């Protein structure tokens, strides 16, 4: 099989772990076609899920069933990143283009009033969208959000840069092992991450931190869920900044989670938090 075929096969293998009845749709936007996986009751409150960079909508496989029990779940492959979205339209130059892309997605799917959750890079996109269009959202959940309330760890950024010097097939696993202290527990997910070494992405937008005055003014009810063992940033520092900048937000820490273990590994506690928050 070609390298791209290996990645697509691994993607399909993870998809088999999703709830019965999950549907894949391709949504047109000015930036290109966006792949969205949909499940849950048609009359449920919509819940949009944005994954961390390089993980695709498949990252939510361990959460989809719990979240789809009462919500219409829309799990998105980020435009410009790995997955089955096709970035063949307007260029992605900055955060404004990602909010415009998400606006177009909300328009096409009639998602006004939807809840929104994101992990890592997806959390940064989600927060920027909440600041841009708070009237479009119900509630917002940010899972170990990077570049939202405090800077990323220079050591993490250096390790990520050094990882690019390794053979392509070793890169995803090397960063996960360093950050989490082990390989992914699920062999199917482990194979998927290895497969991303062969995947293609067009553009991952750089991540300026939001303005503090904008964060303080954000009216969207927000959950900030941090990984206590995250090496992407200093979790206590992020928690303190989140409480200072968004005093109405609920800020919790999962003490045994790492940045890269979210949202896939040992998901029971995370699922309970999200289900309760979005209820």
Regions found by a protein language model. Give the residues of each.
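Active-site loop/oxyanion-hole signature of alpha/beta-hydrolase fold enzymes
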Residues: 74-117, 271
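Conserved HGGG/HGGXW glycine-rich cap/lid loop of the alpha/beta-hydrolase fold
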Residues: 30-83
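Conserved alpha/beta-hydrolase "nucleophile elbow" surrounding the catalytic nucleophile
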Residues: 51-53, 114, 118-123
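Alpha/beta-hydrolase fold catalytic core
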Residues: 1-47, 70-71, 111-112, 272, ...
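Conserved loop-alpha-helix segment in the C-terminal half of the alpha/beta-hydrolase fold
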Residues: 223-258
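Flexible "cap/lid" loop of the alpha/beta hydrolase fold
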Residues: 124-131, 138-167
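Conserved alpha/beta-hydrolase catalytic His-Asp/Glu region
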Residues: 151-156, 166-220
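Catalytic histidine-centered segment of alpha/beta-hydrolase-like enzymes
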Residues: 257-267
């Amino acid at each position: 099989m070609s390298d791209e075929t290996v990645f697509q096969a691994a993607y399909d293998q993870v998809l088999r772990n999703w709830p019965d009845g999950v549907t894949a749709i391709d949504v047109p936007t000015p930036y290109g076609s966006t792949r969205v996986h949909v499940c849950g009751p048609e009359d449920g409150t919509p819940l949009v899920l944005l994954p961390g960079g390089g993980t695709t909508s498949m990252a939510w496989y361990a959460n989809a069933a719990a979240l789809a029990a009462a919500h219409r779940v829309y799990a998105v492959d980020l435009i410009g990143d790995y997955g089955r979205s096709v970035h063949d339209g307007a260029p992605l130059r900055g955060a404004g283009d990602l909010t415009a892309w998400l606006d177009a997605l909300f328009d096409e799917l009639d998602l006004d009033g939807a809840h929104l959750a994101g992990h890592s890079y997806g959390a940064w996109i989600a927060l920027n969208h909440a600041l841009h269009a708070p009237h479009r959202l119900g509630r917002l959940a940010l899972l170990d959000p990077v570049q939202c309330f405090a800077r990323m760890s220079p050591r993490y950024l250096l390790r990520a840069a050094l990882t690019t010097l390794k053979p392509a097939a070793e890169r995803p696993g090397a960063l996960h092992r360093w950050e989490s202290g082990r390989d992914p527990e699920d062999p199917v997910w482990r194979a998927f991450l290895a497969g991303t070494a062969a995947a293609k992405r067009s553009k991952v937008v750089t991540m300026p931190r939001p303005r503090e005055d904008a964060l303080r003014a954000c009216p969207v009810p927000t959950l900030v869920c941090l990984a206590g063992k995250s090496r992407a940033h200093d979790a206590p520092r992020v928690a303190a900044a989140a409480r200072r900048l968004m005093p109405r937000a609920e800020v919790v820490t999962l003490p045994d989670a790492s940045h890269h273990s979210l949202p896939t590994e040992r998901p029971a506690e995370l699922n309970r938090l999200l289900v309760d928050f979005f209820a």
